């Protein structure tokens, strides 16, 4: 049987943080982000692996007209060394004119391969329709494609996508709100009210009272210098402040394809019993009373005492010590050689019955 993999996180978001984290590792400055660019262009110089489509021919004719070449009316160039492509790039924050960025080139027609091609000058536009970069250069394609006369074909990786390292030159800068206003806002990568408040407290302890405040579960506003020249040093100091983020919420993440199970520290099970096929999983909870000695000053308290049993049709039984967690359940199911699908069904049934204290996420 395929074994189930259990992963207990002690340092990630599903469990408590064992070490302090820097602000720059858990939050981003609002407005300081990369921007996606896209353009439409032509790749030429292909060794017979191009295409002949209406939009490719139209683009090819428009390119010739830009160079002053006018084809006779009704002429349809049958070129197999040209391909229409979409060019994409990501423009980092604070990119300046003249800097270069990588581009990805993808065929949108029936071209067999872009290997050996050259991208002609292509304008890359942002969401607002303005041109922010211009791309051109020779493609690097890791894939390959070969076809025999009898129709047999061999393809490795993806020959219709290539990259051009430093293939686009930035022509226009994208403005950011970095230098505007009296405040700088930090947005948490993972929203959490407690983490937001702790971040604000850490900044106030470093800068002084009332310098930072949590707006909501995601954003923390920090009063910043008005002089732009001072904000770089200010942010450099702020983003390296260390603090203790809040413990993550109780979650169970199950990858049904690999059988991997990620269990948060705070996940607990209530009393329940599940029968799945020939396997039975039983959870029992007893409430014991702890009585202090006379005149000791102690208090009478109720102490939960939990046990779990897993049995199969052949009579196998597994017993566990009190103090039940989902870790015990997973190990018990693993002992009887259950497939990942068995545990998926058990976890879903327990969640539907309200026996799991936490979120169940199946990916």
From Swiss-Prot:
Gene Ontology CC: bacterial-type flagellum basal body, distal rod, P ring; outer membrane-bounded periplasmic space
Family: Belongs to the FlgI family.
Keyword Signal: yes
Role played: Assembles around the rod to form the L-ring and probably protects the motor/basal body from shearing forces during rotation.
Main location: periplasm
Subcellular location: Periplasm; Bacterial flagellum basal body
Subunit structure: The basal body constitutes a major portion of the flagellar organelle and consists of four rings (L,P,S, and M) mounted on a central rod.
Superkingdom of source: Bacteria
NCBIfam families linked: PRK05303.1
Sample GO molecular function, one term: structural molecule activity
InterPro entries the UniProt entry points to: Flag_FlgI (IPR001782)
Pfam families, per the entry: FlgI
Keywords annotated in UniProt: Bacterial flagellum, Periplasm, Signal
GO biological process, one term: bacterial-type flagellum-dependent cell motility
Protein name, UniProt field: Flagellar P-ring protein
Residues in the signal sequence: 1-20
HAMAP family for the chain: FlgI
């Amino acid at each position: 049987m395929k074994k189930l993999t259990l992963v207990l996180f002690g340092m990630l978001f599903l469990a408590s943080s064992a070490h302090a984290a820097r602000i720059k590792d858990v939050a981003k400055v609002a407005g300081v982000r990369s921007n996606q660019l896209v353009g439409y262009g032509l790749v030429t110089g292909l060794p017979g692996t191009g295409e002949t489509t209406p939009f490719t021919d139209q683009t090819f004719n428009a390119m010739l007209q830009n160079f002053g070449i006018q084809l006779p009316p009704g002429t349809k160039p049958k070129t197999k060394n040209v391909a229409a492509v979409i060019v994409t790039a990501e423009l980092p924050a604070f990119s300046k004119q003249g800097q270069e960025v990588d581009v990805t080139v993808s065929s949108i027609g029936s071209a067999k391969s872009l290997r050996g091609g050259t991208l002609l000058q292509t304008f890359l536009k942002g969401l607002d329709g303005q041109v922010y970069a211009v791309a051109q250069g020779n493609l690097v394609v890791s894939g390959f494609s070969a076809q025999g006369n009898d129709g047999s074909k061999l393809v490795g990786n993806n020959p219709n996508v290539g990259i051009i390292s430093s293939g686009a030159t930035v022509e226009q800068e994208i403005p950011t709100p970095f230098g505007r206003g009296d405040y700088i806002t930090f947005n948490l990568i993972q929203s959490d009210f407690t983490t937001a408040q702790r971040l604000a407290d850490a900044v106030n302890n470093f800068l002084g009272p009332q310098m930072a405040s949590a707006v909501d579960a995601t954003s923390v506003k920090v009063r910043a210098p008005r002089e732009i020249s001072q904000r770089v040093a200010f942010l450099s100091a702020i983003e390296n402040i260390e603090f203790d983020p809040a413990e993550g919420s109780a979650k169970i993440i199950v990858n049904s394809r690999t059988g991997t199970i990620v269990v948060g520290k705070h996940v607990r099970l209530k009393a329940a019993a599940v029968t799945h096929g020939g396997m039975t999983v039983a959870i029992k909870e007893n409430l014991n009373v702890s009585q202090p000695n006379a005149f000791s000053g102690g208090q009478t308290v109720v102490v939960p005492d939990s046990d779990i049993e897993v049995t199969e049709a052949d009579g196998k039984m597994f017993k566990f010590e009190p103090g039940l967690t989902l870790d015990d359940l997973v190990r018990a199911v693993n002992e009887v050689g259950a497939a990942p699908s068995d545990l998926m069904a058990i976890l879903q049934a327990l969640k539907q019955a309200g026996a799991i204290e936490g979120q169940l996420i199946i990916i």
